[in-house]
Regions:
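Long C-terminal interaction/binding lobes of large macromolecular proteins
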Residues: 140-141, 148-151, 165-170
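Active-site-facing substrate-recognition patch
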Residues: 1-72, 76, 113-146, 185-186
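PRPP-dependent phosphoribosyltransferase catalytic core
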Residues: 2-11, 164-193
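Charged helix-capping and loop-helix junction motifs
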Residues: 91-97
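Short beta-strand-loop/turn "lid" adjacent to the catalytic site in phosphate-handling enzymes
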Residues: 76-91
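Short catalytic/ligand-binding loop motif for oxyanion handling, primarily in non-cytosolic enzymes
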Residues: 85-89, 118-120, 188-189
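Short, well-ordered alpha-helices that flank and scaffold nucleotide-derived cofactor binding pockets
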Residues: 62, 97, 101, 168, ...
């Protein structure tokens, strides 16, 4: 059966997207030390602990400089909102500040406001059935984002729907999304080398 993807989502997924580590969920247990280390980094970053934001900021800054060169200084970094307002602040505030310091990229963190919590993606699953995802209420500073070139960051990409939905909201605000960067991309099969 062919999976149909909404063309607005596909439009964002067709842009330049990159990730730094392969992320294997905890239920995938037969993995090597490299995958375990990547998993620990993702968890530490998501939980805002062990100064993981510094390691991820360094990876992000290096990628931005290699990908965009001096152009990065005229761009803005924005992170996909987390399901809970307090997690958005604890996970991304210092990270965005640090990436901005390292690269000169504009910091879009304070221009996104999470107004209402929502269920996280994992809590929408019920066995093989998924419950309907509730749209998250966020406020974007449309004046700030208008005509800006944006790079969107998220911690983990699985289907890309959260990233694409947020990128579309940014573009509805007048921004031009260049693509997305992710700390990890979800994988389910580990290949030993």
């Amino acid at each position: 059966m062919t999976k149909v993807i909404d063309e607005n989502i596909q439009r964002q997924l067709d842009k330049k997207v990159s990730f730094f580590v392969k992320y294997f969920p905890a239920r995938i247990q037969n993995v090597g030390e490299d995958a375990k280390a990547a998993r620990q980094l993702v968890w530490a970053f998501k939980d805002s602990r062990d100064s993981a934001y510094e390691e991820v900021a360094q990876m992000t800054a290096k990628h931005l400089k290699e990908e965009y060169g001096e152009k990065v200084k005229s761009m803005v970094l924005v992170c996909v909102p987390t399901s809970k307002k307090e997690n958005y602040q604890s996970r991304y505030m210092m990270f965005c500040n640090r990436v901005s310091e390292l690269t000169g990229i504009g910091n879009g963190f304070s221009h996104v406001c999470v107004l209402q919590d929502r269920l996280d993606v994992h809590n929408h699953r019920r066995g093989k059935k998924k419950t309907e995802r509730q749209a998250q209420l966020i406020d974007l500073d449309t004046y700030y984002f208008k005509d800006k070139e944006i790079c969107v960051f998220d911690d983990v990409v699985t289907t890309g729907k959260s990233y694409a939905d947020f990128a579309n909201k940014l573009e509805d605000s007048g921004a031009h999304v260049l693509g997305g960067m992710f700390l990890g991309k979800t994988y389910y099969r580990y290949n030993r080398q």
